[in-house]
Every structure is written in C-alpha cells, then in structure tokens.
Amino acid sequence: MEVRYSQDSESGMLLKNGLKEGKEGKDSQGSISKTFLKDQQESFSPSGAVENCEKSRASSGDPDYCRRILVRDAKGSIREIILPKGLDLDRPKRTRTSFTAEQLYRLEMEFQRCQYVVGRERTELARQLNLSETQVKVWFQNRRTKQKKDQGKDSELRSVVSETAATCSVLRLLEQGRLLTPPGLPGLLPHCGSSSLGSALRGPSLGITANGGSSSSSRSSAGSSGTAGGSPPLPTVTSSGTVTGLQGSPPAHGLFSFPMPSLLGSVASRISSTPLGMAGSLAGNLQELSARYLCSSAFEPYSRTNGKEALDKKVLE
C-alpha cells in the first residue's frame, strides 16, 4: 500500500500545533501573572488587610471592639497594629474655630449679660456673628469652665492673703507688746482659756520696773490675780531685759518659738523712758485687739504643732 503525503500539509500541521502550544503557554503565563498580581494587591490593599486582620482576629480571639491593620514603616517593613473600631481613620481632622476680635467682644458681652444663652437667643446671636449654633454653644461652655477655674484660684488666693495678713498683724502686735496681757485684764481670752495657746498668751503677764526700782502696786495686783486664778506667780521684767518668776515655765522659748527674755527685753527697752504710762497704753492697745486676731486661723498651725508635740511626748513616755 502506498502512502503519500504532502510536505506542505505536514508543515501546516506543525505550524498549527506550534501556534496552539504558544497560545496555551501564553494563556497559562498570563493567568499566573494575574494570579500573582491579585495576591500581591490583596495582601497590600486595605480591604485585603482588613480581611486578613478579621481572619487573624477570629483565630487569635481578639475582642470585638479591636481591629488589626497593616502599616508600612519608613524602612519598608510591614507591621501589624491593633486599633479600636470606633477610631475613624478616614475622617479628616477637625479644624479649630478661630474667632475674630469683633466676635469675641460680642460673645464676651453676651456672657457678662447672661452665662446661659439658649433657644432663640442663641440662634439670633449665631446668625448675627455668622457662626453656627454649635460653635456658640461650645464657646459658652468653655467660657463657663474658665470662669469656674478662675473663681477657684481667686478664692484660694484670697484665703492665703487673709491668713498672711492676719499672721502679719499678730506678729506686728506681738512685736509692739500688745499681746502681753497686763495684770488688770485677766479675762481677755475667754475662748482660748483651755488651750495651750491661751496658756501661752496668759503666761507672759508682766509687771515692769525701770532703773532698778520696783512697783509695789503692780506686784500686789499680780500676786492677787495669780493666787485667785490658781496660776503660778507672774513674771517680772526689769529694764535690763531679765525675767523673774518663770520657774514653772519652759526656759527656752515662749509664744511662736521666740526667745521670751530677748522679746520682753526689747519691749522693756522701748518703754523704759515712760514707765508710768505703760499700763494705760497696754490696756488701750489690748482693748483694740479683737478676738479674731487671737483665735483666727493664723494660730492654728502653732496649736496643732503643740498638740502633736504633747501627743508624741505621751507616746514616748
């Protein structure tokens, strides 16, 4: 049997087969490249990141209010960050409202008139100032908060200033000798009688002698008041600044931790030239001294300190 075939037909078949194979190879290569690009795009796209994060969250057991996102840092590496779902990253940041000088002046005037502007007044004010009602409402809220802070600072400053003024007045009177109770006024301190402050104020009552002499009337009145009240004999200050009659009292310090001999000596040296008018001037000055200076908050730190020291002594004993 004789078989004949044409060379043209064979070459045509080979060409067709080659084209078919090339087309199939091209299609397979294109499908591979498309698949690779799709995988890469999904791995780096936000939706793919969210899906991957949801899958990883479901597998890792993260709470519902958290979400994971993939970010690329400056070095090119990819990191995973956990953020709350309520955080809207796509929303632009709100710009801060800037008011003009005219708007601020008008708002301040309205605030001085009424601190709460609501309803039709707020609508009209916002329309006149070319602002929204929300901006006006927020401004008034911030202004009320600022006023409360300023009032708190002012009240604290006033209390500090009043305490400082009271302390300075007491120290000034103490320096002038007005807090040293004369024998003729034993009942000046009725409110502080049982406290250590009252005993400290009543303790340094004095009879004054100048140029080495002695006043028998002052000593006799001091002795009578001392025996009547059951208190120890009253101290006596000489012109040289020495104090007698303080055997029962602590020798080191007196009121406000001032050395009592030096304090009384300075007072005695100031009034040594006019010894006869001392009792009258002291009585007048003490009557001018009101009870708020003697029992004010300026004495509280010292009374608390004395009470604490006494308690510590009892504990040590």
Curated annotation (Swiss-Prot):
Entries under InterPro entries matching the protein: EMX-VAX-Noto_Homeobox_TFs (IPR050877), HD (IPR001356), Homeobox_CS (IPR017970), Homeodomain-like_sf (IPR009057), HTH_motif (IPR000047)
Residue ranges flagged as DNA-binding region: 92-151
GO cellular component: nucleus
Protein's gene: vax1
Family classification: Belongs to the EMX homeobox family.
Subcellular location, principal: nucleus
Lineage: Eukaryota, Metazoa, Chordata, Craniata, Vertebrata
Molecular function GO terms recorded: DNA-binding transcription factor activity, RNA polymerase II-specific; RNA polymerase II cis-regulatory region sequence-specific DNA binding
Name this polypeptide is given: Ventral anterior homeobox 1
Compositionally biased spans, kind Low complexity: 212-225
Biased composition (Basic and acidic residues): 18-27
Tissue localization of expression: Expressed in the anterior neural keel and later in the preoptic area and optic stalk.
Keyword Cell wall biogenesis/degradation: no
